[in-house]
Amino acid sequence: MTTLPARPEAITFAPQHSALIVVDMQNAYASQGGYLDLAGFDVSATQPVIANIKTAVAAARAAGILIIWFQNGWDDQYVEAGGPGSPNFHKSNALKTMRNRPELQGTLLAKGGWDYQLVDELVPEPGDIVLPKPRYSGFFNTPLDSLLRSRGIRHLIFTGIATNVCVESTLRDGFFLEYFGVVLEDATHQAGPEFAQKAALFNIETFFGWVSTVADFCDAVSPPSLARIA
């Protein structure tokens, strides 16, 4: 067992019964020229987030924590996105951007395309799990719940983009399914103004989970000798 400093209080977990979840670190969300950028969201501060996620992933992997990577998106015909009968059709900023800019049709969040791919700096390794997801929550229409339960995993450490959308949505759904969710705040970034990040973290630490940092996570899961060297 290890104890992680967090807000509103420290949380204790067993690394072998935990997973680090990397949410949607795709070009769409973290790169210039990706969906968020083209839709008018600021992605200029994502590079430190990428670096922090890379650090957290390395520490988690060394500690024997399962790494799960999510990629948000749909088939290139957008059947999986839902038609006018789906609220996703009306609220997805990717779909709205393509309707407003027809020349982008088939490029944003389409499986197999650059936008859908994980950023170059973050590469899954053998033993990791990579899951596609069609909506904001990683629990919706995916095998995430069964994959976690079959491994006895109850604690989920969250990183990724966007804090106030897919990260928070997945953590909230996990809360309702009796998972303990922790967000590493400096390994996340919001879609929208800074207050969206603050509001999401407030919601999480007050109602749905815990908030910590990459440095505290690495110290908590690293052997004492490695922690001292770091």
From Swiss-Prot:
Catalytic reactions of this protein: (Z)-3-ureidoacrylate + H2O + H(+) = (Z)-3-aminoacrylate + NH4(+) + CO2; (Z)-3-ureidoacrylate + H2O = (Z)-3-aminoacrylate + carbamate + H(+); (Z)-2-methylureidoacrylate + H2O + H(+) = (Z)-2-methylaminoacrylate + NH4(+) + CO2
Pfam families, alphabetized: Isochorismatase
Keywords: Hydrolase
GO biological process: nitrogen utilization; uracil catabolic process
Domain of life: Bacteria
Record EC number: 3.5.1.110
InterPro entries tied to this protein: Isochorismatase-like_dom, Isochorismatase-like_hydrls, Isochorismatase-like_sf, RutB
Entry-linked SUPFAM superfamilies: Isochorismatase-like hydrolases
Active-site residues, Swiss-Prot/TrEMBL: 24, 133, 166
Any one Gene Ontology molecular-function term assigned to this protein's record: hydrolase activity, acting on carbon-nitrogen (but not peptide) bonds, in linear amides
UniProt similarity note: Belongs to the isochorismatase family. RutB subfamily.
Function: Hydrolyzes ureidoacrylate to form aminoacrylate and carbamate. The carbamate hydrolyzes spontaneously, thereby releasing one of the nitrogen atoms of the pyrimidine ring as ammonia and one of its carbon atoms as CO2.
Database matches in PANTHER family: ISOCHORISMATASE-LIKE DOMAIN-CONTAINING PROTEIN (PTHR43540:SF6), PEROXYUREIDOACRYLATE/UREIDOACRYLATE AMIDOHYDROLASE-RELATED (PTHR43540)
Descriptive protein name: Ureidoacrylate amidohydrolase RutB
Naturally occurring in which organism (per UniProt): Enterobacter sp. (strain 638)
